Amino acid sequence: MLKADIQLRLSRLTLDTAFTVAAGEVLALLGPNGSGKSTTLRALVGLLPLAGGRVVLDGTVLEDPAQHVKVPPEKRPIGLMFQDYLLFPHLSAVENVAFGLRAKGTDKKTARQKATQTLARLGLEGALTSARPGAMSGGQQQRVAMARALVTEPKLLLLDEPLAALDVSTKTDVRRLLREVLRRSNAANVLVTHDLLDAVALGDRMVVIGDGKIVQTGTPAEVTSRPRSRYVADLVGVNLLQGTARGTVLDVDGGGQIVTAAAASGPILATVSPTAVAVSRQRPEGHEPNTWAGQISAVDLMGDRVRVRINGTPEITAEVSPRAVDDLKLDDGGELWASVSPSAITVYPP
């Protein structure tokens, strides 16, 4: 088990995070660029010295500044996998995988045998084991990098955006393979990604980092069903409103007021699916609650649907069909009315 309490200060970031990862578990770290995800991995490896806290792996203290304990990076039982692979271009696949074992003192014959066996587990056999990275596809290079990270049987496996450099078709196959590998692993696994699909498909738990601090944690279902930051809401694809509830009335921070079906009191978060936002060029007839106007600020194609950002009070995004874009002339901008049924609004505590 990994027990990490990481406190460090850089010129651009102060990182203060604490989490645990059980053996065989996959913890997915998400967050916007510069939030501290990769910095967390570098701290676990030992490349960035802690200012406070401690890192303990299977009962062994890897770092504790208060006790003046710091195990060097090369002595830590950690496997690493990066988005750009970092394979040696002059070595074959089997030589790349065997390198870590040789560096730890394993004899050449045994290292090659273990490297060959690990590559075979990942579907690379025969002539491919003798190929150099330049003669391999992106997916094949990723399998070599995966084998290199696994062959030393690390107690902690760190994966930094491992699928980011792959094309869509290759990514699907490698994601499936990586999921199988991680499910068989006895290591504690930490995955850094900006891709929600990777986090949901591979992670047992998710930790969302913002500005060096943990802003949300839970299972993928818990995090995605109740986002607590604009970042997560954008990943999931829902509108997130924050404000103060008085019964079924929510005073939205930044301006605006909406009516909800569920009553609440005090600080509250509310989500609205863009598909639940109706739009029109004219004010809808009747006196339905949750109807307001705003200026169109963005029109973005998302697959076979279109997202329309309305800069009103509150600001909100609607999802419409391409035909609605033409019928309402949304590309021309201008004023647009938004309507949301109270029953389409989910409220929960922050």
Each language-model region and where it sits:
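Helix-to-loop junction immediately C-terminal to a conserved catalytic motif
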Residues: 45
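Conserved hydrophobic segment flanking the Walker A/P-loop of ABC-type ATPase nucleotide-binding domains
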Residues: 19-23
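Glycine/charge-rich catalytic "coupling/switch" loops of P-loop NTPases
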Residues: 253-300, 322-350
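ABC nucleotide-binding domain signature
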Residues: 28, 70-72, 76-86, 98, ...
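ABC ATPase NBD Q-loop/coupling interface
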Residues: 54-76, 107
